[in-house]
């Protein structure tokens, strides 16, 4: 059964990624994802301001102390959800309604099991892990109180990301944006209520996060019942089909592990940076906050690429995959040129704006980080989109290998180069690693027998 384009309305804006102009469709599909990234970053800033201004530095430090653990939990959960959504997008592209509903049913089952395992492991190991990370005694209990609430809310976080991923899988990137905005606004309101009015402290921030995502899950499910019934499985679709369940499990674990390894690499690099002094850390922190905004066009397009390639892989359109990837690579070059111009004109001013510092060391190091990184945005865009494309076509090991390269590369820089070349080595660490990762991924892409069938042996 072939999927017909969905009738468009204000709340049902499915983008057809399998027919018509390629880049136009990709760009339209990507825009809500880009706004979602921007909104999430702005929300994170507001959330930090609320905790810092109402509860003070100690509470802010408590949340910061478990930041790496939070990223691991969230990254792994999002990775699992994205992996499951990739399989759903393939079924949608193939026009197989039954397969799509079986995929949704299997995703629900695997998601519940994975969430239970993560929650139980967290309940047993989070406190010892915080102690292992040498969390200061004065903030240890607050940090644990926050992260354990997040841990018990993993099932809600997973459901939230799975719902958004499944809607994107059928070409709807608009409604996930709506749900994200609602969740973020509600989270800010609940933060103020729980923290300022009820005096719940750091735990209030965790409860606010879980409740706001829970409300968004409920709204998303209601939307699916009303406007996206294609995603509603019936009882018969919960029958376990070993091949499908293995595909769902392996795809989700591959992406979950990839996110976790990337987060672990960031922790390793931060260890190297922490030995360079307070002013260097301040400059790097400001530069990374700016980087988080400037690389959004690349991460958003990579996310759109995942759905695009998955659908066209399912629809058996290798030519559209090739042409789409070419357009995405060119888009990355445009982003890089824009970043070079932007950083060459105002990098130091932007670092000063974000950091509020007038220290030359802070401003010079932060600006140098931005200027040196900008030309490599084209490489980063190629890396992200190629990795997502390979995962979308069923490749699991090779994209994961790229994350291992990143992790090992950061260990090498921390041990060998940062002690000798200090912050210059920090700046060059990721661009150099991006180049090695991209080479590995492009070789894998060029040898993919679906995209380049002539190379199939």
Regions found by a protein language model. Name each.
Residues 122, 165, 191, 220-224, ...:
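Structural signal for membrane-spanning alpha-helices in multi-pass inner-membrane proteins
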Residues 28-47, 149, 160, 183, ...:
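Transmembrane helical elements of multi-pass membrane transporters/channels
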Residues 28, 51-71, 137-142, 202-203, ...:
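Interfacial/gating helices of multi-pass transporter permease domains
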Residues 81, 150-168, 176-184, 205-218, ...:
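Short runs within selected transmembrane alpha-helices of multi-pass transporters and secretion channels
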Residues 1-30, 88-155, 197-253, 309-376, ...:
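Short alpha-helical transmembrane segments in multi-pass integral membrane proteins
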Residues 60-120, 157-176, 283-347, 380-394, ...:
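Small-residue-rich hydrophobic transmembrane alpha-helices
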